[in-house]
Design a protein with these regions (language model features):
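C-terminal functional extensions of proteins
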Residues: 141-220
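Soluble extramembrane regions of membrane proteins in the secretory/endomembrane system
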Residues: 1-170
Length: 220
């Protein structure tokens, strides 16, 4: 997880939808965080989906390894030897005592990567230092601002797909058939856009009425 409270409205709906999709299909989920705030975001998403919705077991169905400082150095460490970088998880449990960590030693032991990214370090570092060198496929969800930075990697095939901002989150919610924050956020955004357009129209009407009145007052 590479996002925090300020970008939660865009990224969090993507992350919860991805988790629903993964768990629905029986996949085990391993979560690491390149941002300190990302750990809190991940805990909230996992509690909401893994615990409350699916009733899954920590350490067997999902694990939160947590945050480590170092930016792209953390990504490189995960690629080469994840057990050297993560000796304990976010709860302080030794990784050797976590059932689903059995057989997990390096990045190539994973089947797929999804990066919920709001900037640096994030999706670009994952593709450059993990996915591309190892061949493990990845996709990403980013803020609307970051889309243009990541799109070249999508177009080249290095990233399998991208969820672009709140519209992307809403589209993915529709895809998996579970409407959530992304959909309601887009509804609110659409209403706000309509209100703005209405004010522009009213402003223009008022301007032309006033101009017409002034012309009449001047006698032409």
């Amino acid at each position: 997880c590479e996002y925090g409270p300020s970008t939660k409205p865009e990224i969090h709906p993507m992350v919860t939808s991805i988790l629903r999709h993964f768990f629905r299909n029986g996949h085990k989920v391993y979560v690491v965080c390149l941002w300190p705030d990302g750990q809190f975001m991940a805990e909230e998403a996992l509690d909401e989906v893994a615990v409350d919705e699916f009733g899954l077991t920590y350490g067997t169905d999902y694990v939160l390894l947590g945050f480590r400082p170092g930016n792209e150095a953390v990504v490189k460490g995960i690629v080469s030897d994840i057990r050297k970088l993560y000796t304990i998880d976010s709860r302080g449990t030794k990784v050797t005592d976590i059932p689903m960590m059995e057989g997990i030693n390096k990045f190539e032991d994973f089947d797929f990567l999804f990066s919920g990214s709001a900037g640096f370090p994030g999706s670009i570092e994952w593709v450059q230092f993990a996915s591309d060198p190892t061949g493990v496929p990845m996709s990403t969800g980013t803020t609307s601002i970051q889309v243009n930075e990541v799109m070249p990697y999508v177009q080249s095939g290095q990233v399998q797909g991208i969820l672009a901002g709140m519209p992307g989150a809403a589209e993915y919610e529709a895809l998996i058939g579970v409407k959530g924050i992304g959909t309601s956020g887009m509804d609110a955004q659409s209403v706000a856009h309509l209100v703005i357009v209405l004010f522009i129209v009213l402003g223009n009407v008022g301007y032309f009425i006033e101009r017409s009145r002034k012309k009449k007052d001047r006698g032409y």
